[in-house]
Amino acid sequence: MGETIRFGISIDDKLLESFDQLIEHKGYANRSEALRDLIRASLIDVKWENGEEEMVGTVTLVFNHHVRDLSDKLTEHQHAYHHQIISALHVHLDAHNCLEVLVVRGKAREIKKIADELIGVKGVKHGKLVMTATGHDLH
């Protein structure tokens, strides 16, 4: 971690008031912590948009396991991308529905492609990709 530097910013009073409400709602200790998180989030977004950066994340899927061949298709996808899908969690939500959470790692564009393919499999009721940085470049 580098040296901490103090700096000042000019901000509209109403915007600052809204920011302070957000800080309180999220439970930040102070404005500095909240601002650091916002900067990190922006940097991660840029890496995600670039497509070439190494990212990690999760693909969450909800599906009815009674749909013909669906479980097999999802498993085939996982095996096809075994280098990028580094872990899987399967939960039986009820007698029909399952939740699958896949931990993924790789270039952002590759991860997005994998997620789109999995979410697009016929029978998947809902799917979502959540990406973040590997932590190497975050300070």
UniProtKB/Swiss-Prot annotation:
The record's section on Gene3D superfamilies has: ACT-like. Chain A, domain 2, Met repressor-like
Record carries keyword Lipid metabolism = no
GO MF, one term, reads: DNA-binding transcription factor activity
Q: Which cofactor does it need?
A: Ni(2+)
One family from Pfam that matches here is RHH_1
NCBIfam families tied to this protein: PRK00630.1 (NF001884), PRK01002.1 (NF002169), PRK02967.1 (NF002815), PRK04460.1 (NF003381)
This chain's protein is named: Putative nickel-responsive regulator
- Which organism was this protein described from? Pelobacter propionicus (strain DSM 2379 / NBRC 103807 / OttBd1)
